[in-house]
Design a protein with these regions (language model features):
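Extended substrate/RNA-proximal surfaces in nucleic-acid metabolism proteins
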Residues: 29-145
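Short acidic/histidine-rich active-site segments
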Residues: 166-182
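Low-complexity, acidic/Ser/Thr- and charged residue-rich accessory regions of DNA metabolism proteins
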Residues: 291-390
Length: 390
């Protein structure tokens, strides 16, 4: 994982700008500084833009996402937390012995944006530990402008919670590899004048005409913690079954509460109520996963999957184009029939998802009678199928 590798792979996925991640770590800062500086908070390498971002864990194991306007702001934040963290120089996501109020207050001091990371996951998210934003951020709650939804949630899930209606929803994915399966599994499209920190900040705050215009992400059923399930054997349970079992699986291991069940507990409404500013949400499944399923591969990381992925990207430019916009007759000239058929199934909303849970990702299935597979609408709410329409 290097900034250089990310800068090359991002455009092949169709991404213009990435958060650097880990910008409080000295070694990673050196990587970032190999980029050309566009302004204090924006950097570029191989045509890909970067803004300074980091994730920190507080003393309740809640993860917070930060965006910094400059290296000096990031350094000032690092200086403020260094006596409260034992792994600031050894871990990209440091553990900080401070609470959400303190971390948000320090962010405000350096004019950084801060909000909950992967807000609903059962181990290290705000709603795993807290019942509300106020419980976490206290008198700093008005300063919180966004929540990152995480892979196991979407706009429909989150907009059942009234206190989130004022926030901007970010659909990001904290890639641990520049491999196309992991990079930009989710992303947010913004209406901005330029791809810079200041313009992105305005878009997150929804000021000056800047705003998010599209959230793109996995179907939440594909997330590792969508349903309540055992963390060892991955047997799925309803909330009622898990509670009766006192969250202990028949195999003896722990049942972990799923995002769907947790949101059901804290929801204000049974059905989502979207505020006027909320943009559409489009579901995408990584092209590598679709190729793997079409080829009968057990993993999208095989050489044969990568070869077919590379052929399609070479022909059409980016993964998004292949999935949504490329003419299927042209796709058929580039790849094997099974892959063309699978892409057609995706576009026709016929791909099905076996939900994830307990730490195991959900899996996609091509049209099947399997009772465990549930059909998921994989297009925008208004049935437009091209991201270019946004």
């Amino acid at each position: 994982m290097t900034i250089a590798a990310l800068s090359v792979e991002a455009p092949r996925k169709g991404i213009t700008l990435l958060g650097t991640g880990d910008c409080l770590h000295t070694a990673w800062q050196k990587e970032i500084r190999t980029c050309t500086s566009i302004d204090e908070g924006t950097f570029e390498l191989n045509g890909t833009r970067f803004i300074l971002s980091a994730e920190v864990e507080d003393n309740h194991r809640v993860h917070h996402l930060l965006y910094f306007p400059s290296f000096s702001a990031a350094d000032a934040y690092k200086e403020a937390i260094k006596t409260k963290s034992k792994n600031l120089e050894t871990d990209g996501r440091p553990n900080v012995d401070m609470n959400g109020v303190e971390l948000a207050s320090l962010a405000k001091d350096v004019e950084a944006l801060i909000g909950p990371a992967h807000g609903f996951t059962p181990w290290t998210a705000i709603y795993a530990y807290h019942p509300s934003l106020q419980s976490c951020y206290g008198d700093m709650t008005p300063y919180i402008s966004f929540i990152e939804l995480g892979l196991s949630a979407d706009t429909d899930y989150a907009d059942t919670i009234e206190e989130l209606h004022r926030l901007t929803f970010l659909t990001n994915s904290d890639c641990h590899s520049p491999h196309p399966v992991r990079l930009a599994r989710e992303f947010t499209r913004f209406e901005v004048h330029d791809a810079t920190f200041s313009e992105i900040k305005k878009a997150i705050l929804r000021v000056g005409g800047n705003k998010p215009v599209l959230n793109v992400g996995l179907p939440p059923q594909e997330g590792k913690y969508n349903e309540s399930a055992c963390i060892s054997c991955f047997t799925h349970y309803t909330l009622e079954e898990a509670m009766k079992r006192r969250w202990k699986c028949s195999c003896g291991k722990r049942i972990k509460k799923g995002v769907k069940d947790r949101i059901g507990e804290i929801a204000s409404f049974k059905q989502p109520r979207h505020p006027p500013h909320r943009p559409p949400y489009v579901y995408l499944i990584p092209l590598s996963e679709i190729i793997a399923k079409a080829l009968g591969q057990h993993t999208p990381f095989t050489q044969s999957v990568t070869k077919r992925w590379d052929e399609l990207i070479a022909a059409f430019g980016s993964e998004i184009t292949v999935l949504l916009d490329a003419d299927l007759e042209q796709v058929a000239r580039v790849t094997v029939p099974a892959i063309t058929t699978a892409i057609q199934a995706f576009r026709d909303h016929k791909v099905r998802i076996v939900p994830g849970g307990g730490g195991k990702y959900g899996t996609i299935e091509l049209p099947t009678d399997d009772d465990r597979a549930i059909p998921v609408s994989l297009g925008p709410r208004n049935s437009q199928t091209s991201l270019l329409d946004y």
